[in-house]
Amino acid sequence: MSTKNFRVSDGDWICPDKKCGNVNFARRTSCNRCGREKTTEAKMMKAGGTEIGKTLAEKSRGLFSANDWQCKTCGNVNWARRSECNMCNTPKYAKLEERTGYGGGFNERENVEYIEREESDGEYDEFGRKKKKYRGKPVGPASILKEVEDKESEGEDEEDEDGDLSKYKLDEDEDEDDADLSKYNLDASEEEDTNKKKKSNRRSRSKSRSSHSRSSSRSSSHSSSRSRSRSHSRSSSSSRSRSRSSSREHSRSRGSKSRSSSRSYRGSSTPRKRSYSSSRSSSSPERSKKRSRSRSSSSGDRKKRRSRSRSPERRRRSSSGSSHSGSRTSSKKK
């Protein structure tokens, strides 16, 4: 069979004999070269591409020939001499892979092989790793270690059973009951109690004294602070009273001055001077109050003076009237 006219179709199989390796058609049950029968070991062939044929070659107008083949995976058209695809490297004739299902995909769980694993009590597991319970122990044969441990445990049990009981004093309570009590001073306990009471009383007294002294010092400090605050308040009150008295004296002196000024300006009949003095007095509220007082006093003085001035005029008039009447009577007598 020439290689030029060799075409592989799906289902063709390769002879299982390594020396032969002939590719047989799918319809054959035995090898065409060596006559060996077809078995399950025979690998099936798979065509990675198909020839395009004459019709497609004519449509390409001389670009491709009828023997060129088209890849099944990527669809690229390759020359006839190529054994692999130029794009995806898929072989033109390949062996059919076995569908075991171990790698996933088609027929994934059909024929699954379960590995039977035996759990052993050995030092190492199935992967050759040392188990955790044996990691900290010294390296050695397991049988020897077990024998040594068994011997040690048996020896300890025998020692516990045959041990002397003399070290355990079982009659110790009875001996204590029958022992002499002469070595114990029973009266010493009472003396110790009295001494303890005295010491406690002394301590309580010293504590009470210290507390009393602390309280007295605190009270003295409080009283001193209070006296200081009182003296401070008194001094502040005295300073306040002084300031008040000085302000009163100052106001009185100002009032007397205003009164004297008002008296000096009484004789003048011009209203301008009075308005001038009133404008000066209105500069402050205190001056206005004092001026009002001085005005009231000046008005009272004016009334008194007017009444006084009128009274001598009346006297004069009365005296003149009396003199006229006397002269009239004297003239009548004449």
Curated annotation (Swiss-Prot):
Keywords: Metal-binding, Nucleus, Phosphoprotein, Repeat, RNA-binding, Zinc, Zinc-finger. Residues 150-163 have a biased composition (Acidic residues). Residues 213-224, 258-285, 319-334 have a biased composition (Low complexity). The keyword Metal-binding applies. InterPro entries: Znf_RanBP2, Znf_RanBP2_sf, ZRANB2. A zinc finger (RanBP2-type) spans 9-40, 65-94. It comes from the Eukaryota. SUPFAM superfamilies: Ran binding protein zinc finger-like. GO terms for molecular function: lipopolysaccharide binding; RNA binding; zinc ion binding. It is found in: Nucleus. One of its GO terms (biological process) is RNA processing. Residues 196-212, 302-318 have a biased composition (Basic residues). SMART domains: ZnF_RBZ. GO terms for cellular component: nucleus. PROSITE patterns: ZF_RANBP2_1, ZF_RANBP2_2. Signal peptide: none annotated. Pfam families: Zn_ribbon_RanBP. Residues 117-334 are annotated as: Disordered. Belongs to the ZRANB2 family. PANTHER family: ZINC FINGER RAN-BINDING DOMAIN-CONTAINING PROTEIN 2, ZINC FINGER RAN-BINDING DOMAIN-CONTAINING PROTEIN 2 ZRANB2-RELATED. The RanBP2-type zinc fingers mediate binding to RNA. May regulate alternative splicing by interfering with constitutive 5'-splice site selection. This is Zinc finger Ran-binding domain-containing protein 2. The lineage of its organism: Eukaryota, Metazoa, Chordata, Craniata, Vertebrata. The gene is ZRANB2.
